[in-house]
Amino acid sequence: MKLKSVLYLLMLLNCLGLKSAHAATLVHGISTSWHSFSNSVSQTWNEPQTFDLYMPALTWHNRWTYDADKIDRYNERPWGAGGGMSRYDEKGNWNGIYLMAFKDSFNKWEPIGGYGWEKTWRPLNDPDFHFGLGYTAGVTMRDNWNYIPIPLLLPLASIGYGAANFQMTYIPGTYNNGNVYFAWLRWQF
């Protein structure tokens, strides 16, 4: 009986050790990712290559996820403006810090600010043509949520030529909420 108890104890300790190793690996991965993220934000802030003008262009509510009466009431022509700074890193990927304000679906002002990153491809012989896929992490505030700061992490995509870029994101959601395509023009100076 004692041998059986010792074996159970050894198996339990082994499992705890394995979980501890996995936890250490996870913590290390998160720490490495955070340092990479914060270094990219810091470098973009301290060493921008361009300054950017943001012009909201389009808001589209997914017709498969909204009632027609809601769509009829929503603003899908956001107007506003914003500014930012950006750089291309040593791998040719875009990094940007931005602040923008625009008229939301209810025609109320919505500010948004954050950091964006895109893996950038230049598939043609013309180096000015590019497209990218990445993410944006930031904060927004909306009138219908009493302008409480709301953190966000959203997909980001773009297509551009030279200094002109058309960037976009999709805000996921539920029925009659979220599920919005939002796009803007970004001009680099």
Swiss-Prot record:
- What are the residue positions of the site described as Role in lipopolysaccharide recognition? K70
| GO BP | lipid A biosynthetic process
Q: What is its main location?
A: membrane
Protein name as annotated: Lipid A acyltransferase PagP
Q: Which HAMAP family match?
A: PagP_transferase
Indicate where this protein resides in the cell. Answer: Cell outer membrane
Which Gene Ontology molecular-function terms are recorded? acyltransferase activity
Q: How does it assemble?
A: Homodimer.
Superkingdom of the organism of origin: Bacteria
Note whether Magnesium occurs among the keywords.
no
**A matching Pfam family:** PagP
User: Which residues act catalytically here?
Assistant: H61, D104, S105
| Gene Ontology cellular component list | cell outer membrane
Supply the gene name. pagP
What are the protein's UniProt keywords?
Answer: Acyltransferase, Cell outer membrane, Membrane, Signal, Transferase
| InterPro entries recorded | LipidA_acyl_PagP, OMP/PagP_b-brl
Q: Give the record's family classification.
A: Belongs to the lipid A palmitoyltransferase family.
